[in-house]
Amino acid sequence: MHCPFCRHSDSRVIDSRETDEGQAIRRRRSCPECGRRFTTVETAVVAVVKRSGVTEPFSRGKVIRGVRRACQGRQVDDDALNLLAQQVEDTVRAAGLPEVPSHEVGLAILGPLRELDEVAYLRFASVYRSFSSADDFEREIEALRAHRRVSTSR
């Protein structure tokens, strides 16, 4: 690790701690050349494999932008979107795989979004599952109603 102050090519780790609920490691480092200290944060990169085969790092921001589009005009605040994105990231990381298909990210979005806002869920699902007719919407609405009945009967 290069020192950010003197650019020396070596540093010594003084302390390491888990942060972000175990998703990252915070390391306190010392430069043997200039003696200054600095902090690094290390995270494992989860890559998303798109349908085209292109691989890109998982992005909470991209999840939020996609869900925000589905929530347009709905009473959904930024905190709820951030929490949903965190849930999606946790689900993706829990798979324990270095690469996750974009399809799995979409599936990870559907569950929390259904709980957050049913209309936004229908909008997102209609694009994600490529609805082509009103029948597709009717089937999904019936599945939502069945899910609601099961949830309320508990």
Swiss-Prot record:
Q: Which GO terms describe its biological process?
A: negative regulation of DNA-templated transcription
Please give the Gene Ontology molecular function terms for this protein.
ATP binding; DNA binding; zinc ion binding
Q: Does the keyword Transcription apply?
A: yes
Entry cofactors: Zn(2+)
Q: Where are the zinc fingers (unnamed)?
A: 3-34
One Pfam family matching this protein: Zn_ribbon_NrdR
Has UniProt tagged this entry with the keyword Magnesium? Answer: no
Q: How is the cofactor bound?
A: Binds 1 zinc ion.
What NCBIfam families does its record include? transcriptional regulator NrdR
Q: Protein name, please?
A: Transcriptional repressor NrdR
Q: Which organism is it from?
A: Mycobacterium leprae (strain TN)
Its taxonomic path starts at: Bacteria, Bacillati, Actinomycetota, Actinomycetes, Mycobacteriales
